[in-house]
Amino acid sequence: MNKSMLAGIGIGVAAALGVAAVASLNVFERGPQYAQVVSATPIKETVKTPRQECRNVTVTHRRPVQDENRITGSVLGAVAGGVIGHQFGGGRGKDVATVVGALGGGYAGNQIQGSLQESDTYTTTQQRCKTVYDKSEKMLGYDVTYKIGDQQGKIRMDRDPGTQIPLDSNGQLILNNKV
């Protein structure tokens, strides 16, 4: 064989071995490509949202009293009682019966007017409202415990990372990786 051919084969073999050696160094020295997720705990916040809850209710009112002292009932009762009392007895007894009838009638008229005033009512419909709170949960993120080799770390993420978190060439977590 020719010396130049042997030299060419030797240079080719040496170059191939050199490339293979450099490639194998990079493969064997390369660290992990993913961090293993040990746990991912959801972080939630309870949110109370206020709202108005209204309903219509029937309300009974007493009409305003125009004769608070019930004078009308007392006077009418006294007159009626006096007339009825005057029908009994004779002489001086008639006068006593008239006075007793007037007093009894006045009292009865007063009580009747009071009873009528208390039962003099009207109804209206009113809207009654109260504030109630609806509860809901808002997801804040996840507290993630991860492991790279023998080292363990914690981080808060806004999504569940699954079982692995990718690493960049420097061994740092890639957190903006869209899934």
From Swiss-Prot:
Q: State which residue ranges cross the membrane.
A: 5-25
Q: Which GO terms describe its biological process?
A: regulation of single-species biofilm formation
- UniProt entry tagged with the keyword Transmembrane: yes
Q: Which UniProt keywords apply?
A: Membrane, Transmembrane, Transmembrane helix
Q: What protein family does this chain belong to?
A: To Rickettsia 17 kDa surface antigen.
Q: Which NCBIfam families match?
A: PRK11280.1 (NF008437)
Q: Which PANTHER family match?
A: OUTER MEMBRANE LIPOPROTEIN, PTHR35603
Q: What name is this protein filed under? A: Uncharacterized protein YcfJ
Give the organism the record lists: Escherichia coli (strain K12)
What taxonomic classification does the UniProt entry list for its organism? Answer: Bacteria, Pseudomonadati, Pseudomonadota, Gammaproteobacteria, Enterobacterales
Q: What gene, per UniProt, encodes this protein?
A: ycfJ
